[in-house]
């Protein structure tokens, strides 16, 4: 083809195309302008699903974090509002609703149930509105913090349990016996006990050596055995304290001495009745590496020594108990039971008494037998021997002049009183009753009661006169006192007791026994009735020795008695006027051989009383 023709065709083609697209270009321009005018839309735009997509993505991230944590520890989150939702959907019941204790999770807690409810399997339920998505991150952070706190708490428990298990394993490895096999647990740290077992870990060697000396002032027995372990030095203590102590007190004591924490020590009381435990302590006490201070505790010796075992097998002997009560002058049943039980740790027969099932029976029999012996011994004694023995039991000294000054103050001739008092002590017929007459507050009762305490007499009370046995104490008395006799008392005496005041034998009714024949002991009576001036009691005038106290008892400026009338005053009085009262039996006893002590059981001479 000719090149000129080819160029013409190209130009014609361009011209044709330009003419055809002219109108289209104008319409396209107009349309492009309309599109550009709508490029910026100022109308309110709807959110759509972008926020929900973001919340789902965040929830998935938290869910992955939770699953990663649950692979290590099986934890389940608590949803405190899930219970509220379930309760709100229920139909109301007739019963009144109860107040429930709900956990408070802070601001906007109600959105927690809508945002992310995590069940035990780790799944999540639906999401709420746009407002809930704004706080979803905060709620998720709170859940993660709660999980971390629970993980830390569980970890601390695991570490503490692991430490204790490690220490117990080390103890068992070193001594071939578990710590719990040697001790009995005390749940309360304030429970006191004399014997304690201690296992200490991690203390320094020099402090353990120093504890040997520092603990001696607190203990009657101390045993220390030291070993080395992977935790450092381990020490085993067996302690018998002088006084009962609690775990808290002993813990503070070891913290000061060994400078260790309470987690590094075990403190429990030993098993006192376990033969394997006692054998273990007895065996290691003979070890060359053990430090011993004091004598072996009785609870170990009792189970490991043949002599102690024979003593434990010894049956109860009532005669030894009676001998003990007689030597200590115990005749009251509660006193005998209490004091003999206290001797169980020292006396084998007392320990056997505690093992008996008939303790009440034995106590009654012991008290009754002691009374029999004491009464028979009293009847064999003369008045002089009895007074001498009673005054020897009074410790201290008094002034006999107080009694003489008091009699002079009341206007009584001392020589006349001394003669009557001598006849009273010797039981002269018709001179066997001394009466003190006077108005109130003159010292009558103080005068006779102090004499009664000094001579260990008995007291009669007319309030018991309706009973046939109100005079029964006269059977076991060397002297008796009837205080504040009224007209009814004198009428009774005038009717029934004339022979008794004479000092002749009378028949005395005894409880649970047949009437016995006795002579009334010397009798002191105080009264406000002028019995010697009343003709109604004329038959008693010859049987009574009467002295009148007309003056009130003297007092000092402080309101205290100016004259001291007590058992010490009477002790000095009898010592001063012993010969004048013709109480010479004590002097005769000093010239002869001393009487042998009473024995009601076959016992050795060196036996403990």
Swiss-Prot record:
Top-level class of the enzyme under EC nomenclature: isomerase
Location of the SF3 helicase domain: 398-562
PTM notes: Phosphorylated.
Ranges for region Disordered: 84-103
GO CC annotations, alphabetized: host cell nucleus
Binding site for ATP: 438-445
Documented EC number(s): 5.6.2.4
One Pfam family it belongs to: PPV_E1_N
One biological process term in Gene Ontology: DNA replication
Keywords annotated in UniProt: ATP-binding, DNA replication, DNA-binding, Early protein, Helicase, Host nucleus, Hydrolase, Isomerase, Nucleotide-binding, Phosphoprotein
Domain of life: Viruses
Region called DNA-binding region, residue ranges: 146-313
Catalytic activities: Couples ATP hydrolysis with the unwinding of duplex DNA by translocating in the 3'-5' direction; ATP + H2O = ADP + phosphate + H(+)
Main location: host cell
Subcellular localization(s) per the UniProt record: Host nucleus
Short sequence motif named Nuclear localization signal, residue ranges: 70-72
MF (Gene Ontology): ATP binding; ATP hydrolysis activity; DNA binding; DNA helicase activity
Modified residues (Phosphoserine): 76
HAMAP family registered for this protein in UniProt: PPV_E1
Entry function: ATP-dependent DNA 3'-5' helicase required for initiation of viral DNA replication. It forms a complex with the viral E2 protein. The E1-E2 complex binds to the replication origin which contains binding sites for both proteins. During the initial step, a dimer of E1 interacts with a dimer of protein E2 leading to a complex that binds the viral origin of replication with high specificity. Then, a second dimer of E1 displaces the E2 dimer in an ATP-dependent manner to form the E1 tetramer.
Subunit-level organization: Can form hexamers. Interacts with E2 protein; this interaction increases E1 DNA binding specificity. Interacts with host DNA polymerase subunit POLA2. Interacts with host single stranded DNA-binding protein RPA1. Interacts with host TOP1; this interaction stimulates the enzymatic activity of TOP1.
Family, similarity comment: Belongs to the papillomaviridae E1 protein family.
Official protein name in the record: Replication protein E1
Provenance organism: Bos taurus papillomavirus 6
Gene name as annotated: E1
């Amino acid at each position: 083809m000719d090149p000129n023709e080819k160029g013409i065709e190209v130009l014609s083609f361009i011209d044709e195309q330009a003419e055809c697209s002219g109108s289209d270009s104008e319409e396209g321009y107009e349309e492009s302008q309309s599109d550009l005018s709508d490029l910026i839309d100022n109308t309110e735009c709807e959110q759509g699903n972008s926020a929900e997509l973001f919340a789902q993505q965040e929830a998935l991230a938290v869910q992955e974090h939770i699953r990663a944590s649950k692979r290590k520890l099986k934890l389940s989150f608590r949803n405190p509002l899930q219970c509220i939702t379930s309760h709100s959907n229920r139909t109301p019941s007739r019963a009144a609703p109860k107040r429930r204790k709900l956990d408070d999770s802070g601001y906007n807690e109600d959105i927690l149930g809508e945002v992310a409810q995590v069940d035990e399997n780790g799944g999540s339920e639906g999401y709420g509105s746009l407002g809930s998505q704004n706080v979803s991150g905060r709620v998720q952070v709170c859940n993660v913090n709660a999980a971390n706190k629970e993980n830390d708490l569980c970890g601390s428990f695991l570490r503490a349990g692991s430490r204790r298990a490690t220490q117990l394993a080390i103890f068992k490895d070193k001594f071939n016996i578990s710590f719990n096999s040697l001790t009995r647990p005390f749940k309360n740290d304030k429970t006191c006990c004399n014997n304690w077992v201690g296992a200490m870990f991690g203390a320094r060697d020099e402090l353990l050596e120093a504890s040997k000396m520092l603990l001696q002032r607190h203990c009657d027995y101390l045993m220390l055995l030291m070993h080395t372990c992977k935790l450092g030095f381990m020490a085993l203590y067996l302690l018998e304290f002088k006084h009962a102590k609690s775990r808290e007190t002993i813990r503070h004591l070891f913290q000061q001495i060994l400078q260790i924490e309470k987690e590094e020590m075990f403190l429990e009381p030993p098993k006192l009745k376990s033969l394997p435990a006692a054998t273990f302590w007895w065996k290691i006490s003979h070890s060359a590496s053990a430090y011993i201070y004091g004598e072996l505790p009785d609870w170990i010796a009792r189970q490991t020594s043949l002599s102690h075992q024979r003593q434990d097998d010894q049956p109860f002997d009532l005669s030894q108990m009676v001998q003990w009560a007689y030597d200590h002058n115990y005749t009251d049943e509660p006193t005998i039971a209490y004091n003999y039980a206290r001797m169980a740790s020292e006396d084998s027969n007392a320990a056997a008494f505690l093992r008996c099932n008939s303790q009440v029976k034995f106590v009654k029999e012991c008290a009754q037998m002691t009374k029999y012996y004491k009464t028979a011994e009293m009847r064999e004694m003369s008045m002089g021997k009895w007074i001498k023995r009673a005054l020897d039991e009074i410790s201290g000294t008094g002034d006999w002049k107080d009694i003489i000054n008091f009699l002079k103050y009341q206007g009584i001739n001392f020589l006349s009183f001394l003669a009557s008092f001598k006849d009273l002590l010797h039981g002269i017929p018709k001179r066997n009753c001394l009466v003190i007459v006077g108005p109130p507050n003159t010292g009558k009762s103080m005068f006779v009661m102090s004499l009664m305490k000094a001579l260990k007499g008995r007291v009669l009370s007319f309030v018991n006169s309706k009973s046939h046995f109100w005079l029964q104490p006269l059977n076991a008395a060397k002297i008796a006192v009837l205080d504040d006799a009224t007209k009814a008392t004198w009428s009774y005496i005038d009717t029934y007791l004339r022979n008794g005041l004479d000092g002749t034998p009378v028949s005395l009714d005894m409880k649970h026994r047949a009437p016995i024949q006795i002579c009334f002991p010397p009798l002191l009576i105080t009264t406000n009735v002028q019995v010697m001036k009343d003709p109604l009691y004329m038959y008693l005038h010859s049987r009574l020795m009467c002295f009148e106290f007309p003056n009130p008892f003297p007092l000092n400026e402080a309101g205290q008695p100016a004259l001291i009338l007590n058992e010490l005053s009477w002790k000095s009085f009898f010592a001063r006027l012993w010969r004048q009262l013709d109480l010479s039996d004590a002097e005769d006893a000093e010239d002869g051989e001393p009487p042998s002590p009473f024995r009601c059981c076959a016992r050795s001479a060196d036996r403990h009383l």
